[in-house]
Amino acid sequence: MAAAFSSDGEAVLRRTLDPAAAAPRGDKDEFYEVDRAAAFVRDGGFRKVALQFPDALLADAAAVAARMEEVTGAEMYVLGDTTYGSCCVDEVAAEHVSAGAVVHYGPACLSPCRKLPVLHVFGRQPLDVGRCAEVFRELYPERQSRVVVLSDVVYAHAMGELEKQLCHEYPNIIFSEVVCGDAPSPTLPGEVRQFGRRFHMEAAEELQDCSMFYVGAEGLALTSFMLTWNRFPFSSFDPATGHGRRETLNVNRALMRRLYLVERARDAHVVGILVGTLGVAGYLDVLEHLHQLVRRAGKRSYTLSVGKPNPAKLANFLEVDIFVLVACAQNSLLDSSEFYRPIVTPYELELACNPAREWTGNYLTDFRDLLPGACAHIELPPAVPAAEAIPDVSLITGEMRATHLCDPLAPQPPSSTTLACRDQTRALAEMSPAATFLESRSWRGLEQQLGKTAVSKAVQGRRGIAIAYEDEGREQS
């Protein structure tokens, strides 16, 4: 899972793309929906359009761009390797070429964008509908079963035909619909809209009795579905292999791992906020929200933008106790087992720092749900004086820790700490995470050794560049 979002630069350089394997079979105009994309460009009056391709479809980029320029007369720019996840629209790269719109090809997380108009062309991957229906009947022999059918976006085009084959046999089957863009809030009772999918239930309580059937390969999308709807049994059909199965992912074990990371976040003193997207709408709002949350919790935060995170990059920030990744819903669940410090989601940081938010069994991966006015937003409770705070003990270290919130309007502590106040437990109230980290290091830098080191005059140093200093040339001659 880590390789889907974080990547090593050497791995990218060594990767070999096979054009024959990457190129889809059949008519390219139909696969890439050239007519629909051309209508989008003409109707919008765009003169410059960015075409974003994932690595798997990059072999066809030149042909598709030439075809689009031929039918629209607009100037096309191909966007290849994206700064973050390929499922997200790379608005930053599109703005570099002054593009008026983006056509995003391939799998997508369907996160709404901030600025540019976007058209999603998923690519019509082939699906054996007959085989899929046969597998569905094997997995659900009871004809009265309540099943919600979800699919990867690349197979959404075939869901209508699958529905025709199954709706007469299964009267309680429900097919989800792919929704692109930032759709308005649900207005119909019983409507569920999440992960860019929408389906309708006759009654809200009916969802508790449903099973989920996913059409697509194993990946981040399926993992997000299973963690979010963790109370429902999942089955899947992989079109590449033609086999179906009941998903055996131990959701409880995965959730226990995530809750362990919440406990690590409670113990952290320094939080690194990783910017994992620059195009998803609301990312600036959630960054500000996380800054306020961390500050109210008495922790220190730093905002880091390192592109695609990998262990080597994040290992440079030793002072950071835990990272929180602000990314789209699919890329938020980054496996941090290979990293030196844990990586949590904004929802997990809220569980750790907001006393008013409790674990209810519902897991959230979309950070926009946490913002004011959203469905899952919970206000921070009033600040509690340190003397009245209930002490808490870490379940990991066994040490005492502070869990009360600080007053957001309280003035910053003075720079001088000659006089420090003590609370009722006679403990010092001020603590510096930086000083604590420095004290724990085995090597703290060069010591001055005042009065012990002889004073020497400045001498002439070496000249040149590291590859060939001037004195090295004289020595060789």
Curated annotation (Swiss-Prot):
Keyword Endoplasmic reticulum tagged: no
GO terms classed as biological process: protein histidyl modification to diphthamide
Pathway: Protein modification; peptidyl-diphthamide biosynthesis
Cofactor(s) the protein needs: [4Fe-4S] cluster
Membrane-spanning ranges: none
Recorded superkingdom: Eukaryota
Disulfide bonds: none
GO cellular component, one term: 2-(3-amino-3-carboxypropyl)histidine synthase complex
Family statement: Belongs to the DPH1/DPH2 family. DPH2 subfamily.
Subunit note: Component of the 2-(3-amino-3-carboxypropyl)histidine synthase complex composed of DPH1, DPH2, DPH3 and a NADH-dependent reductase.
Function: Required for the first step of diphthamide biosynthesis, a post-translational modification of histidine which occurs in elongation factor 2. DPH1 and DPH2 transfer a 3-amino-3-carboxypropyl (ACP) group from S-adenosyl-L-methionine (SAM) to a histidine residue, the reaction is assisted by a reduction system comprising DPH3 and a NADH-dependent reductase. Facilitates the reduction of the catalytic iron-sulfur cluster found in the DPH1 subunit.
Protein name: 2-(3-amino-3-carboxypropyl)histidine synthase subunit 2
Lineage: Eukaryota, Metazoa, Chordata, Craniata, Vertebrata
Gene: DPH2
